[in-house]
Amino acid sequence: SKVLSGFYPDFAKEIGAKAADAFDLGVQYPGACQTAPGSAPYFYEEDNWVDDMQLAAVELYKSTKDEKYMKLAVNYGRMEPVTPWMGADSARHYQWYPFMNVGHYRLGNSTDKRVSDEFKRNMRTGIERVFEKAKENPFLNGIPYIWCSNNLVAALLTQ
């Protein structure tokens, strides 16, 4: 809604309210939602969801300034301090999508130094886990060799 607010203020307000409603639904019914991509013979087996809720809470905090969203963002972030593929040997197709935790990045930029330090440390820990895996690899690559591993590379570089 922030992006559209200067162009379509009424619509931006409406989708901002819908974002809060969708978030509340996620709080009420926690968990991953499996996606079947059309007629493909597989589905996206996403296991994690707290990173999505963390990012949603951070963005809702930024748009509403309601402290309850900041507290929820921190709590969701603590449920998954490191993105699970980091340091792992393998993963299923899209198991830990979107492969990086933007919510950690957003909290790492918090004005609350304690929160900022905690989530920067979490990101550093994930990077260190990948580096430790890389030490065991003849190509110095700590990224699991899986379908879409290029996405993991991009996620690591982004983090």
What are these regions (language model features)?
Residues 1-159:
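Glycan-recognition and catalytic cores of secretory/periplasmic carbohydrate-active enzymes
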